[in-house]
Swiss-Prot record:
Organism: Homo sapiens (Human)
Residues where Fe cation binds: H135, D137, H196
Keywords (A to Z) from UniProt: Apoptosis, Cytoplasm, Dioxygenase, DNA damage, Iron, Metal-binding, Nucleus, Oxidoreductase, Ubl conjugation, Vitamin C
Annotated protein name in UniProt: Prolyl hydroxylase EGLN3
Residues reported to bind 2-oxoglutarate: R205
Gene name of the record: EGLN3
Length: 239
């Protein structure tokens, strides 16, 4: 859906008439030309600076392999940005717009009640065939309900550069290939409804991801983590 230069007053209409219906019907959607060239360039330049100054580190695997870095499974380099850091004004503006879109979706997201989100994960696939194998963002109820990815790749040609995000919507007879083109914003459900992969990239590929949390599921996940931590500490003390 091409949007040109978004005005804040348009966000509620976009959320209610496009994002909500698409999420319920197919599980994902994307908006093109989200920020416009000028602001999008500001975000891109800041991300490039983070990359060039060595701020990015190898992405880690979650689940049973939590904390493990295996480059053949996940080849990106990442850092986390809150938006209040010096020089991150454009990123902060981007995050505020995404926040407003999700806020306007509100109760129409079904069972979810969104109160918070993660920091922004800035990611770079450095080329050389790096990608991310098929996975689910939230397979075990950690609270994440919506994944939002903003792409930053100018003149991207998927036939030459690869790097497609391929989504395998649960229960659907199709797959969805999303090219990571500059100024594109993607939304999809974070749970098992949307297994996905990043296909091998043969050029530097930048993206920024935020996850929105369902309040109840997130609280329960934190409670389970605290209980597990206490049990582990107790077992270590007994030993």
């Amino acid at each position: 859906m091409p949007l040109g230069h978004i005005m804040r007053l348009d966000l509620e209409k976009i959320a209610l008439e496009y994002i909500v219906p698409c999420l319920h019907e197919v599980g994902f959607c994307y908006l093109d030309n989200f920020l416009g060239e000028v602001v999008g360039d500001c975000v891109l330049e800041r991300v490039k600076q983070l990359h060039c100054t060595g701020a990015l580190r190898d992405g880690q695997l979650a689940g049973p392999r939590a904390g493990v870095s295996k480059r053949h499974l996940r080849g990106d380099q990442i850092t986390w940005i809150g938006g209040n850091e010096e020089g991150c004004e454009a990123i902060s503006f981007l995050l505020s717009l995404i926040d407003r879109l999700v806020l306007y979706c509100g109760s129409r997201l079904g069972k979810y009640y969104v109160k918070e989100r993660s920091k922004a994960m800035v990611a770079c696939y450095p080329g050389n065939g790096t990608g991310y194998v098929r996975h689910v963002d939230n397979p075990n109820g950690d609270g994440r309900c919506i994944t939002c990815i903003y792409y930053l790749n100018k003149n991207w040609d998927a036939k030459l550069h690869g790097g497609i995000l391929r989504i395998f919507p649960e229960g659907k007879s199709f797959i969805a290939d999303v090219e990571p083109i500059f100024d594109r914003l993607l939304f999809f459900w974070s749970d098992r409804r949307n297994p996905h992969e990043v296909q091998p990239s043969y050029a530097t590929r930048y993206a920024m991801t935020v996850w929105y949390f369902d309040a109840e599921e997130r609280a329960e996940a934190k409670k389970k983590f605290r209980n597990l931590t206490r049990k582990t500490e107790s077992a270590l003390t007994e030993d």
